[in-house]
């Protein structure tokens, strides 16, 4: 059997749409109409999405081969078949939406270049190829599925309690479709700057610095407890003639649900795992992707496969309730997708076995618990003491944290817990709340250099 090698980017080539030279950027934006990017907020003002994160992930190649906001035919293809017009599979609508009032005020049309401003500075351009209208509720419903149309995995109708459904439902009705280009490269703030590895850089580090041939991706939106640590260690035993050489932790950074951990604590918590030797730093690397999470379980897992293949991973671990919230999907929906496909979502076979599909190899995992009889963290498929199991409960752990109780070492490493405390002191609360979301939306993860917009 041939040895596994780094897969090509999804679509065959990494998208890189970032202008590095100031003089070229200034020529591109001279005389362009401008539009200040705005967050999507709930009626109470709580931010749930900022399109700048999608623009960053498109232009740096995380979403390759997507290059911008989708034209209408491509939107329909994605909703109906989870494929782009180029045939490559892709799970989610990527759209630049504006209100009818803003569209009228802008007075732009197909063929125009729109300069997108962020924090008062030039950020990116959108070369408008098409302008069309959507029904946001229809897009939201078709994005995630229904029990009637997707009976294999959808268990409950989606509603306003589902964060991803609300994000699409609250899209504005006017879509400006076209390619994005970043013209004023942002600088990441601490601590994000040391975890920023866009696909081209990540692939370079994996090949030349880490010298990993096989790499398994770990998706996270949580500070790691010991169960997460064991998942990473055990899933990494996959590979070919030897275990995977590297574990790439890729955190999703963006708007979170209230009660989640702050992004900074998530990144530095995972960093503590290798910094203090629980997994050797030679085998463990922490990174992130900008994305306001949609919590789409099997649909979200497709995006994770796209992102991590683009970053250079050969394998991806998937647990139960992957990227899920509530009970909208079967808890094993992602594993069903990657083991047999979901025909109603356009997959007669797993995503890595269809034409124009992914090359990343799935590693479906069961769960880990503490067994007092084995006196160790046990894998559910190995341990026979089911009646004695003590599950890792995220809500129970959050309750301990909220009470200021130091979790036992068997639940969370003390060095990881200290990162929660560190950011608790910064924000005066250990978890995401409205105040944190509003501050994060105002400050964002980046700063932009000052840049003048030349006249035409």
Swiss-Prot record:
It is an enzyme of class 2 (transferase). Its EC number is 2.7.7.4. The keyword Membrane does not apply. Pfam families: ATP-sulfurylase (PF01747), PUA_2 (PF14306). Pathway: Sulfur metabolism; hydrogen sulfide biosynthesis; sulfite from sulfate: step 1/3. It catalyses: sulfate + ATP + H(+) = adenosine 5'-phosphosulfate + diphosphate. Keywords: ATP-binding, Nucleotide-binding, Nucleotidyltransferase, Transferase. GO terms for biological process: hydrogen sulfide biosynthetic process; sulfate assimilation. One of its GO terms (molecular function) is ATP binding. SUPFAM superfamilies: Nucleotidylyl transferase, PUA domain-like. NCBIfam families: PRK04149.1 (NF003166), sopT (TIGR00339). Belongs to the sulfate adenylyltransferase family. This is Sulfate adenylyltransferase. It comes from Archaeoglobus fulgidus (strain ATCC 49558 / DSM 4304 / JCM 9628 / NBRC 100126 / VC-16).
């Amino acid at each position: 059997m041939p040895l596994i090698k780094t897969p090509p980017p999804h679509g065959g080539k990494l998208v890189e749409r970032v202008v590095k030279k100031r003089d070229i950027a200034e020529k591109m934006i001279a005389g362009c109409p401008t539009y200040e990017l705005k967050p999507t907020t709930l009626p109470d003002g709580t931010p749930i999405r900022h399109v700048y994160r999608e623009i960053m992930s498109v232009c740096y190649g995380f979403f390759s081969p997507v290059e911008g906001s989708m034209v209408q035919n491509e939107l329909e293809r994605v909703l109906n078949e989870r494929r782009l017009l180029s045939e490559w599979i892709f799970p989610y609508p990527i759209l630049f939406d504006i209100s009818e009032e803003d569209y009228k005020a802008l007075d732009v049309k197909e063929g125009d270049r729109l300069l997108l401003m962020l924090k008062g500075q030039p950020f990116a351009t959108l070369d408008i190829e098409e302008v069309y209208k959507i029904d946001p509720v229809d897009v939201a419903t078709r994005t995630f599925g229904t029990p009637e149309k997707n009976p294999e995995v959808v268990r409950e109708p989606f509603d306003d309690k589902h964060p991803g459904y609300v994000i699409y439902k609250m899209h504005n009705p006017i879509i400006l479709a076209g390619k994005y280009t970043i013209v004023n490269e942002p600088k990441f703030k601490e601590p994000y700057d040391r975890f920023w590895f866009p696909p081209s850089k990540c692939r370079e580090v994996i090949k030349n610095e880490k010298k990993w041939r096989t790499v398994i991706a770990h998706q996270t939106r949580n500070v790691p407890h010991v169960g997460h640590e064991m998942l990473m260690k055990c899933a990494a035993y996959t590979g070919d003639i030897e275990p995977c050489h590297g574990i790439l932790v890729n955190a999703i950074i963006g708007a979170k649900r209230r009660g989640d951990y702050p992004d900074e604590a998530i990144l530095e918590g995972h960093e503590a795992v290798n910094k203090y030797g629980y997994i050797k730093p030679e085998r463990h690397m922490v990174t992130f992707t900008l994305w306001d999470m949609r919590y789409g379980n099997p649909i979200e897992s497709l995006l994770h496969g796209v992102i991590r293949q683009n970053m250079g991973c050969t394998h991806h671990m998937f647990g139960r309730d992957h990227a899920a919230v509530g009970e909208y999907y079967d808890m094993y929906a992602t594993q069903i997708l990657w083991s047999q496909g979901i025909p109603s979502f356009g997959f007669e076979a797993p995503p890595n076995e269809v034409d124009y599909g992914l090359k990343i190899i799935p590693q479906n995992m069961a769960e880990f618990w503490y067994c007092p009889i084995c006196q160790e963290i046990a894998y559910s498929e190995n341990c026979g003491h089911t009646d004695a199991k003590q599950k890792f409960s995220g809500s129970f752990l959050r309750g301990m944290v909220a009470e200021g109780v130091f979790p036992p070492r068997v639940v969370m490493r003390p060095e990881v817990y200290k990162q929660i405390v560190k950011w608790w002191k910064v924000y005066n609360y250990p978890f995401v709340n409205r105040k944190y979301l509003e501050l994060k939306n105002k400050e964002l993860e980046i700063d932009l250099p000052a840049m003048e917009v030349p006249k035409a």
